[in-house]
From Swiss-Prot:
Active site residues of this protein: D440 (proton acceptor)
Domain Protein kinase span(s) in chain numbering: 315-604
Amino acids binding ATP: L321, G322, Q323, G324, G325, N326, G327, T328, V329, K343
Ranges per topology, Extracellular: 29-251
Listed name of the protein: Cysteine-rich receptor-like protein kinase 42
Modification Phosphothreonine, positions: T474, T479
Organism from which the protein derives: Arabidopsis thaliana (Mouse-ear cress)
Topological relation to the membrane, as annotated: Single-pass membrane protein
Length: 651
């Protein structure tokens, strides 16, 4: 929103400038050689968003003006924090004063393209271009070259073509400029002085082909990257093509007035843009800080920025624990010797305020052994910081999917992580003072302490859920592969969305495979586990690293298969069929608690369920809820083909 406000403000200045100043300039530019034949604006780059971009542009334009006092061609490049390269070329038949006048008009029109990162303007007497890269030796461009034809027609179908060819040949032979006239038709060809003879020839050959399209028209113009070609039924160039050195007094006065007005307008433009930018930035910062102050005012959990800065060795790279979409986490050692995790937020927008409030307001008042504890925050420094308890073993995904550590977690430890995560979610859904939906349960958001006990982290996407509501309607946010289908399709959010994510997590832990890892023979993890379940070979889905342990510990393999069934129950297509987290805990801990037969998960068509992993049999399995859901969800296996989890936020 802030960037949009800046852009709109800048455009208002341009509009004001165009309506109130350009009429005066137009009155001094009746000479047809200052007629604008083409203005082309490029896209925007990161450089054009730099606050130094406009001042650099103004300085470039001023430097070009000074160079044109002695010649008709000039380039300028300012290599500062934002680099801008500019080129001006007057046609060789123009006198110095005519050249200055043409440039003055071009200089007042080209700001219409700002803050675009590139622009070209063709006048009938000169050419002006700026870019964020050095382009001086460019001759042609399929994307940018253009031509224009007049509306008036003549009888001769080859009118202007032959004389244009002649002018182009003369220009190549005589160093880049040539004119020609025959049978009442006149033409002018001009290459930029930065081009060599061969590049000039290539550019003008293309220009001749372009004006050839203006068959039976009184005038035609080709406006290419490195040259300009024009023909007309009247003589528009000066004399025989050689420039004039005498300067008429009234034209000199006009040039002085136009240049002075141009410089004055550019200064007003720059000053207005800078002021509006600063005012907008200040208002947004005050608004954000005001919201934070009103929402978070507990002095016991406030940290001084300087304290956290020193605790992390000034955010040293050696202290970095991890990096996510909304910030970087560092290890900090407080003055009392306590280790903490300091999250350095990178946002300063409305989304940042919302996620900051979620982190602070939702979990600062709740405590559970399986939830990462928020110790406090700092909002008074140049950036906002959150302080958490330090969890030494980092995240679960590093243990499961790092080949060097995959054997560290045995089945007993994995079961403990599954159960602890379930208890943490059950507390959020019904045991805490408010009902909370996490929305982003995944292996990278489950941290492990020194005893490998799980702690759910990252509450930036969490939502508070009223006791009187059956669901929330909200924008989609979460990680692809973990999001529940009804949430993806309809935006309806309930606790069952977390249950679905937990089910995916269970399958990943038990199988040691990422949800988005695709195997051509068996499909994705969810599909593979389901197919093996229908074949009564669920044990084959378990992590091969656990094979030796299952052989040594009697009953552990059956227990693991039971856990996989619970995972399938949690990932059923219909949210009403999924168990609550309290029921999940009872299924995992009580020997005699009934475990229903799961129905097929979403994103799997019934035809895909007939696949035999060995190709020796055909399975037919009916479902009671999937058929209806599959008519609504048209997503196939491509839903899970990304190589790594990607977070979607469309709030």
């Amino acid at each position: 929103m802030r960037c949009l406000t800046k852009t709109r403000s800048f455009h208002y200045v341009i509009i004001f400038y165009s309506f109130f100043f350009l009429p005066f300039l137009s009155s001094s530019s009746d000479d047809q050689r200052t007629t604008v034949s083409g203005l082309f604006c490029g896209g925007r780059s990161k450089s054009s968003a730099d606050p130094n971009y406009i001042p650099t542009f103004v300085e470039d334009m001023h430097s070009l003006s000074l160079k044109l006092t002695t010649r008709r061609f000039a380039t300028e490049s300012l290599n500062s924090t934002t680099s801008i390269y500019a080129l001006i070329q007057c046609h060789d038949d123009l006198s110095p004063s005519d050249c200055q006048l043409c440039y003055a008009i071009a200089r007042t029109r080209i700001p219409r393209c700002l803050p675009s990162s590139s622009a070209r303007i063709f006048l009938d007497g000169c050419f002006l271009r700026y870019e964020t890269y050095e382009f001086y030796d460019e001759s042609v461009s399929d994307a940018s070259d253009s031509f224009s034809c007049s509306n008036d027609t003549v009888l001769d179908p080859r009118f202007g073509f032959q004389v244009s060819e002649t002018a182009a040949r003369v220009a190549v032979r005589k160093g880049g400029f040539g004119v020609a006239g025959e049978n009442g038709v006149h033409a002018l060809a001009q290459c930029w002085e930065s081009l060599g003879k061969e590049d000039c020839r290539v550019c003008l050959e293309k220009a001749v082909k372009e004006v050839k399209r203006c068959v039976s028209r009184r005038e035609g113009r080709a406006m290419n990257t490195g040259c300009y070609l024009r023909y007309s039924d009247h003589k528009f160039y000066n004399g025989d093509g050689h420039h004039k050195f005498h300067v008429l007094f009234n034209k000199g006065v006009i040039v002085a007035i136009v240049l002075t007005t141009s410089a004055f307008v550019m200064l007003i433009l720059l000053a207005t843009y800078v002021i509006m930018t600063k005012v907008s930035k200040t208002k947004q910062e005050k608004r954000n800080l005001g919201l934070v102050s009103r929402k978070f005012n507990n002095s016991k959990t406030k940290f001084k920025y300087e304290t956290l800065e020193k605790a992390t060795d000034y955010f040293s790279h050696k202290k970095m624990l991890g990096q996510g979409g909304n910030g970087t986490v560092f290890l900090g050692i407080l003055p009392n010797g306590k280790n903490v995790a300091v999250k350095r937020l990178v946002f300063n927008t409305r989304d940042w305020v919302e996620e900051f409030f979620n982190e602070v307001n939702l979990i600062s008042g709740i405590q559970h052994k399986n939830l990462v504890k928020l110790l406090g925050c700092s909002i008074e420094g140049p950036e906002s910081l959150l302080v958490y308890e330090y969890v030494p073993n980092k995240s679960l995904d590093q243990f499961l999917f790092d080949e060097s550590q995959s054997k560290v977690l045995n089945w007993s430890q994995r079961l403990n992580i599954i159960l602890g995560t379930a208890e943490g979610l059950a507390y959020l859904h019904g045991g805490s003072p408010v009902r909370i939906i996490h929305r982003d349960i995944k292996t990278s958001n489950v941290l492990l302490d020194d005893q490998l006990n799980p702690k759910i982290a990252d509450f930036g996407l969490a939502r508070c859920f009223g006791l009187d509501k059956t669901h929330l309607s909200t924008g989609i946010a979460g990680t692809l592969g973990y999001m529940a289908p009804e949430y993806v399709v309809r935006g309806q959010l309930t606790e069952k969305a977390d249950v679905y994510s937990f089910g995916v997590l269970v399958l990943e832990i038990a199988c040691g495979t990422r949800i988005n890892a695709f195997v051509p023979e068996t499909g994705h993890l969810l599909q593979r586990v389901w197919n093996l379940y229908t074949l009564n070979r669920l044990v084959e889905a378990l992590d091969p690293c656990l094979k030796d342990e299952f052989l040594q510990v009697q009953g552990s393999e059956a227990e693991a298969c039971k856990v996989l069934r619970v995972g399938l129950l949690c990932t059923q297509a219909s949210p009403s069929l999924r168990p609550s987290m309290e029921e999940v805990i009872r299924m995992l801990t009580e020997r005699d608690y009934p475990i229903p037969s799961p129905t097929s998960p979403p994103f799997l068509r019934v035809s895909s369920l007939t696949t035999d992993l060995e190709g020796s049999s055909t399975i037919s399995h009916s479902t009671n809820s999937t058929t209806t859901f599959n008519t609504m969800v048209k997503t196939d296996q491509a839903s899970y083909t990304s190589s790594e989890s990607s977070t979607t936020r469309t709030i």
